[in-house]
Amino acid sequence: VLMMADGLGLELDELTVESEVELATEDISIAAGLVPQGTVAAQRWEWCGVAYGRDVIRLEAIYKVHKSVAPQWQSPAWVCTIEGSPRLHFEADKWTTNGLVGTAMRAFHAIPAVVNAPAGVRTFLDLPLIAGANVVQQ
């Protein structure tokens, strides 16, 4: 959220963070092993960047060990919604495959920019990416 605000040329008044967990109601066997009953089987996180008295950037992340856990939370997916003019909305329902491919593509295509960058720690904002600076209206 902080890097998105920076890329938008936006100074946040506040950053809020909320989280909650769901426990396994029974033993769950997954590829990585056993998730015992009573242990954390899902997490929901939400970060909100507040400016001009309203949430201007909101990021929600839901992690589940199995799709049957925490049915009240949205199923794992990649969803991006930009409320603006025009409004943009994108959903990728094959969250594991698309998420892994999306992450790998981002890293793969960054190689030339990272190689050509000065030595040191860099963020996506330091590399030649397009950012919509100064587009959040008061």
Predicted regions and their residues:
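C-terminal helical cap and adjacent loop that interface with cofactors, partners, or active-site loops
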Residues: H66-Q138
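Active-site-lining helix/loop region of Rossmann-like oxidoreductase modules
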Residues: V1-A70, P76-W78, T97
